[in-house]
Amino acid sequence: MMKKPVVIGLAVVVLAAVVAGGYWWYQSRQDNGLTLYGNVDIRTVNLSFRVGGRVESLAVDEGDAIKAGQVLGELDHKPYEIALMQAKAGVSVAQAQYDLMLAGYRDEEIAQAAAAVKQAQAAYDYAQNFYNRQQGLWKSRTISANDLENARSSRDQAQATLKSAQDKLRQYRSGNREQDIAQAKASLEQAQAQLAQAELNLQDSTLVAPSDGTLLTRAVEPGTVLNEGGTVFTVSLTRPVWVRAYVDERNLDQAQPGRKVLLYTDGRPNKPYHGQIGFVSPTAEFTPKTVETPDLRTDLVYRLRIVVTDADDALRQGMPVTVQFGDEAGHE
């Protein structure tokens, strides 16, 4: 009779263990079965010419798929081609001037400068002698004071001409000053920078797709005169595909960067996409109005960016997505 209470007690213990184990299993399944709700991120970019001008041609229309590097449109190139020719000519002139500064003066130029000094010296000697004679005549009252002043003026002018010729000869023999050479070099560098800018402007008069995408809007037509930066196209970027979702603080530890998840859409309830958490916002925010959640209470959440690793054309921007965490998704 004593065995019956013992058996009953053991049964109670076993039952309690089973219940506890079942509860633990259920909780672990709940933790591994976190479900979030989000949307495929809408990623658009406005494309424009960096320079202004008249639109010459547009190669794509709304709805067209575009590829990175594809030519989408062109401005009238003529003004930029002319500017490029002018810039090239400016570089040629500046280069020639700089080369002259480096080379210095030729022997022929030095010889001509020396001859000019001799000629100026002879003119000065004559003017000085004439002035000396005029001084003697003025003292004897043979000439007027005005005649003496004219002789002095001629002597001073000849002296100034001689000094100028001597300075020029000295410069020719010593070569150009370092300051003059540096100035010529700076002028050349400025002309080269203007040439680089002209080349860039001509290049930017052609609009090229920065990445793959789909053309959403075409804002202008050929013949339109645009200011620099005016929007020409709006493009939806197709790669990479991101899903934006939000997780509350209680489940934040499950949503770590690198965690793999499964992504379900209404059109593919039994064939999930695969994704990986690439970014978790460092700051909390109130649940956005666009987020669909099982409970509608206001909560502080953290934004997630999930990179879809096997996206196809069926996964459209803005499409609602169910994000499933679980053992089958796994970790990085």
UniProtKB/Swiss-Prot annotation:
Sequence similarity: Belongs to the UPF0194 family.
Stored Pfam families: HlyD_D23
Gene behind the chain: ybhG
Keywords on record: Coiled coil, Periplasm, Signal
Residue ranges that the Swiss-Prot or TrEMBL entry lists as coiled coil: 108-211
Source species of the chain: Escherichia coli O6:H1 (strain CFT073 / ATCC 700928 / UPEC)
One cellular component (GO) term of this entry: periplasmic space
Lineage: superkingdom: Bacteria
Designated name of the protein: UPF0194 membrane protein YbhG
Keyword set includes Secreted: no
PANTHER family: EFFLUX SYSTEM COMPONENT YKNX-RELATED, UPF0194 MEMBRANE PROTEIN YBHG
Annotated SUPFAM superfamilies: HlyD-like secretion proteins, Outer membrane efflux proteins (OEP)
Main location: periplasm
Signal peptide: 1-16
Compartment annotation: Periplasm
InterPro entries from the UniProt entry: CusB_D23, UPF0194_membrane_YbhG, UPF0194_transport
